[in-house]
């Protein structure tokens, strides 16, 4: 036995010396280390001299010690090995690491029937060191220690002893110290190492908060809450939480709460707050770095919170500190006043110096002077402006209802956001004299064979200055004589005229200062003698003529509709363009009309050799097979470009082959920036492939859901404009897509959207009213126009309806249209007049365009050319996108009103968050203490930001959802 132990010791310690130490977590404080003590501990054995024995071996000129026991042939055993008394110190839970080896009982002669392969570990707490007084009853069993590997006979022949490492923990400890004891019950064991330690969470500096070294707790499930302190020049942000972390039993820091931020004038540099350098500033408590002082500011000292403006420059209250200081603009440049009767048109050019700002507006004031007295004063309120005279953004305005024979002086002042901070004004003036009244507006009231009844009108403010009106009339062609009638009224009947004769009539106002402006010369004709006697007959004939003209016009209109592309606007709908679209130079050819689809492929596509294509990884599965990302060698062979590769699966049917090649024949005819580009096909080898350009961001609907809330409205509208441009191109080629949806739009790395997936697409005939009737195939109900669902007929107008749904998908970041409604419910709702509600933060102009796309009558929907034009105008005028459509979160954010069939509100916070697709924030709510619906409904907008919801779109979605959630909770009477 002893010979085996000595031999095992040598081999075992060789393996032990090479074994790496177990990686420890947290900071370990060692209380006892048998291996490091070098045999000087002198542990107590019981019974003395019969069981455990301390053995020594020499390795690398160093003594190696271990306790071993191997009384396997002597019947039942009860051998104890007790450590010295160990002072606990501040430890509450201790960890015990054992390294040992156990010999296989079958390696002994006869199998040693009493042999065991385990031993027991005990501990006892005490406030005193009992010395050599050993009492078993004081010890409590920790565990039975069993090896993972035992050393068998063949291991001895190979001089390899298998080392086991086990770790146990004990706690909480309450006495001053403790003993450990090892009980042998008949095993052959060598104990090489006993290491006892406890754990601390180390001192930590995180998020500009310092956390002290903390002793790990004794109870595994619990976490010790530790308050942190902000580093110098860092503070808890307003409304934020004090920094806290939790020290786990294994010495790891967990669950950080709160944070510190550098105060104004300081920025974060590594783990400290450093004062802003001279010439830099930081004006708030935030994570942002110090900013360089903007233009027209004075150099700032170290640690500045702002930069003072240079003399003559200012900062408006609403200006951010990072904005350069600015000054008022110079006066408007080149002001002109052009008189037009009783109107004056004022025009000017912008100031040559804008003061560094773009918020320039203009104010127009008017002063009138009486020529007789020379007195001047503000213009009377009766003067009218074509638009409000204050806050003008345009550089022209028309002033009307001016009085005749009056001098006017107009002042145009340029102002910007800092003009109110100075007393000086930047203006330019122009004067004009009004010498005449506005010309009368003349109309014919009635006529006979010998008379004409004429009336006229002038603006009311001028009527008081007119004392009479002069009517001049003469026969057309007679320049030698004329007649004059004067009257104080606004009408006159000219008698004694020749029948069936044309007269030239002019009316002029007369004032005390002289003649006013004359009206236009009008031509009026008296009736012929025959015409007056047969008026009824003529009236009847006129009615017939009008009816014939209407019928002829209707026939001509129908002929035009059949000949040209269908024009879908109605006479009273001026929202869309009325111009006729020209026929495209190129018309789409349906590959299915070819007897052999290979002919269409040869005509419209490029055949690629398989050696030029490399498939790299599967990125999806299509209708015909798998879709790969790969590379395509260019014609020069020197460059490879990324491509998407669509394959035709093995075992395909003839119809699948024809449809697969047909899709390639379709794509090969298109060439547009917003249509997916076909690189070529492999049709002569298997598997057949369609190679297209690679779109890095994939399908639009999935991409938007992943980037929820990250884009500006202008970026979203730009995406829609690209899709509309692609569809305009298809429509101009007489092509109907039939499956336009966000899932069939692909997005590249530059956010360019391209129309793809032409599997359901079909061609329109030359007839602009042509449709395509399906053969019973599936129709994407949520995206399809009602007439296409009901009659299985598709037109470009039905594609416009689908585009409206795509607009809604984009503005909602990939929401499912009509949410959880079934297809049957969707069709019923549409036929009942329901339309998808306003998306959150959707510009009014965009939602109006959606509603136009969803007109029940397809003839009233816009064309894609109209849509592109409208979107272009909105993009060129971004301010037009700032007006948001009315938004009702209870409708526009689809919230199930209850959870479960019994009408009970959401039972859990996670269930509610999942219903609004915000489940990624579940842990944020839990960590911040919002663990129940009753707590959630009390949250404010600041609370939502505080728990870590950073994206504005997500903040609004949760906030709007809370409105409906509060209603639900109040309805069922849950107290909040």
From Swiss-Prot:
It is a single-pass type I membrane protein. Keywords: Angiogenesis, Apoptosis, ATP-binding, Cell adhesion, Cell junction, Cell membrane, Cell projection, Differentiation, Disulfide bond, Glycoprotein, Kinase, Membrane, Nucleotide-binding, Phosphoprotein, Receptor, Repeat, Signal, Transferase, Transmembrane, Transmembrane helix, Tyrosine-protein kinase, Ubl conjugation. Residues 606-906 are annotated as: Mediates interaction with ARHGEF16. The keyword Transcription regulation does not apply. The modification Phosphothreonine is found at residue 647. Residues 559-976 are cytoplasmic. Homodimer. Interacts with SLA. Interacts (phosphorylated form) with VAV2, VAV3 and PI3-kinase p85 subunit (PIK3R1, PIK3R2 or PIK3R3); critical for the EFNA1-induced activation of RAC1 which stimulates cell migration. Interacts with INPPL1; regulates activated EPHA2 endocytosis and degradation. Interacts (inactivated form) with PTK2/FAK1 and interacts (EFNA1 ligand-activated form) with PTPN11; regulates integrin-mediated adhesion. Interacts with ARHGEF16, DOCK4 and ELMO2; mediates ligand-independent activation of RAC1 which stimulates cell migration. This is Ephrin type-A receptor 2. It comes from Macaca fascicularis (Crab-eating macaque).
């Amino acid at each position: 036995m002893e010979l085996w132990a000595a031999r095992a010791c040598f081999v075992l310690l060789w393996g032990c010396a090479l074994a790496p130490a177990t990686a420890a977590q947290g900071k370990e404080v060692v209380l006892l280390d048998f291996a490091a003590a070098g045999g000087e501990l002198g542990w107590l054995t019981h019974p003395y001299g019969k069981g455990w024995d301390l053995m020594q071996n020499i390795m690398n000129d160093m003594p190696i010690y271990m306790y071993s026991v191997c009384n396997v042939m002597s019947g039942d055993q009860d051998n104890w090995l007790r450590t010295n008394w160990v002072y606990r110190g501040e430890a509450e839970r201790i960890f015990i690491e054992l390294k040992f080896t156990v010999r296989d009982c079958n390696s002994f002669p006869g199998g040693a029937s009493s042999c065991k392969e385990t031993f027991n570990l005990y501990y006892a707490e005490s406030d005193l060191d009992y010395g050599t007084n050993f009492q078993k009853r004081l010890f409590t069993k920790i565990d039975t220690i069993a090896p993972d590997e035992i050393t068998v006979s063949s291991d001895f022949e190979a001089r390899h002893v298998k080392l086991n490492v086990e770790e146990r923990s004990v706690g909480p400890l309450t006495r001053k110290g403790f003993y450990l004891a090892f009980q042998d019950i008949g095993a052959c064991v060598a104990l090489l190492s006993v290491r006892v330690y406890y754990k601390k969470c180390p001192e930590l500096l995180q998020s500009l908060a310092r956390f002290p070294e903390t002793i790990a707790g004794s109870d595994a499930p619990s976490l010790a809450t530790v308050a942190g302190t902000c580093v110098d020049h860092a503070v808890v942000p307003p409304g934020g939480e004090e920094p806290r972390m939790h020290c786990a039993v294994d010495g790891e820091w967990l669950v950080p709460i709160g944070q510190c931020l550098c105060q104004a004038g300081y920025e974060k540099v590594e783990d400290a707050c450093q004062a802003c350098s001279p010439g830099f500033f930081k004006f708030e408590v935030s994570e942002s770095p110090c900013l360089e002082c903007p233009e027209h500011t004075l150099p700032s000292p170290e640690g500045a919170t702002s930069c003072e403006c240079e003399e003559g420059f200012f900062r408006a209250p609403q200006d951010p500190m990072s904005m350069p200081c600015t000054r008022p603009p110079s006066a408007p440049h080149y002001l002109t006043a052009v008189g037009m009767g009783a109107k004056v048109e004022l025009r000017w050019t912008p100031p040559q110096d804008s003061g560094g700002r773009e918020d320039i507006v203009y104010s127009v004031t008017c002063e009138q002077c009486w020529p007789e007295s020379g007195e001047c004063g503000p213009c009377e309120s009766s003067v009218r402006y074509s638009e409000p005279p204050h806050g003008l953004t345009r550089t022209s305005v028309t002033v009307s209802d001016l009085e005749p024979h009056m001098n006017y002086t107009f002042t145009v002042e340029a102002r910007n956001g800092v003009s109110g901070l100075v007393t000086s004004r930047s203006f330019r003036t122009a004067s004009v004299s009004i010498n005449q009244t506005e010309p009368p507006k003349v109309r014919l009231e009635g006529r006979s064979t010998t008379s004409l009844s004429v009336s006229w009108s002038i603006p009311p403010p001028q009527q008081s200055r007119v004392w009479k009106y002069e009517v001049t009339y003469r026969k057309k062609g007679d320049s030698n004589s004329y007649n004059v009638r004067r009257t104080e009224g606004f009408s006159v009947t000219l008698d004694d005229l020749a029948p069936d004769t044309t007269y030239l009539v002019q009316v002029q106002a007369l004032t005390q200062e002289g003649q006013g402006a004359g009206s236009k010369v009008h031509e009026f004709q008296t009736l012929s003698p025959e015409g007056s006697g047969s008026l009824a007959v003529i009236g009847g004939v006129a009615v017939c003529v009008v009816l014939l003209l209407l019928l002829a016009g209707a026939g001509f209109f129908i002929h035009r509709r059949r000949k040209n592309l269908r024009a879908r606007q109605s006479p009273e709908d001026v929202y869309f363009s009325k111009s006729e679209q020209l026929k495209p130079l190129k018309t789409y050819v349906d590959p299915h009309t070819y007897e052999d689809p290979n002919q269409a492929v040869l005509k419209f596509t490029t055949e690629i050799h398989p050696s030029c294509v490399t498939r790299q990884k599967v990125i999806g599965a299509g209708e015909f097979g798998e879709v790969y990302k790969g590379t395509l060698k260019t014609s020069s062979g020197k460059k490879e470009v990324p491509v998407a590769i669509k394959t035709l699966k093995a075992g395909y049917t003839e119809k699948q082959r024809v449809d697969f090649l047909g899709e390639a024949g379709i794509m090969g005819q298109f060439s547009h920036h917003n249509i997916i580009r076909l690189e070529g096909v492999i049709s002569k080898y298997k598997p057949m492939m369609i190679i297209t350009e690679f779109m890095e961001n994939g399908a639009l609907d999935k991409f938007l859901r992943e980037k929820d809330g990250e884009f500006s409205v202008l970026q979203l509208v730009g995406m829609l404009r690209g899709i509309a441009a692609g569809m305009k191109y298809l429509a101009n080629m007489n092509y109907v897509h039939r499956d336009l949806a966000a899932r069939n739009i692909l997005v590249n790395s530059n956010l360019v959207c391209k129309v793809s997936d032409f599997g359901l697409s079909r061609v329109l005939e030359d007839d602009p009213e042509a449709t395509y009737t399906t053969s019973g195939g599936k129709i994407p109900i949520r995206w399809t126009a009602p007439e296409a669902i009901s009659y299985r007929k598709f037109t470009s107008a039905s594609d416009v309806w689908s585009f409206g749904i795509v607009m809604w998908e984009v503005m909602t970041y990939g929401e499912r249209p009509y949410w959880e409604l079934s297809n049957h419910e969707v069709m019923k709702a549409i036929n009942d007049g329901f339309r998808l509600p306003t998306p959150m933060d959707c510009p009014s102009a965009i939602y109006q365009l959606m509603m136009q796309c969803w007109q029940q009558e397809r003839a009233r929907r816009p064309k894609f050319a109209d849509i592109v034009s409208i979107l272009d105008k909105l993009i060129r005028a971004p301010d037009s996108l700032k007006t948001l459509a009315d938004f009702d979160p209870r409708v526009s954010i689809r919230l199930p009103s209850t959870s479960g069939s019994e009408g009970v509100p959401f039972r859990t916070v996670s269930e509610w968050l999942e219903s609004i697709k915000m489940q990624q924030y579940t842990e944020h709510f839990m960590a911040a203490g919002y663990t129940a619906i009753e707590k959630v409904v009390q949250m404010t907008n600041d609370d939502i930001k505080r728990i870590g919801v950073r994206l504005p779109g997500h903040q609004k979605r949760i906030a709007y959802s809370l409105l409906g959630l509060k209603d639900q909770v109040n309805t069922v009477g849950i107290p909040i």
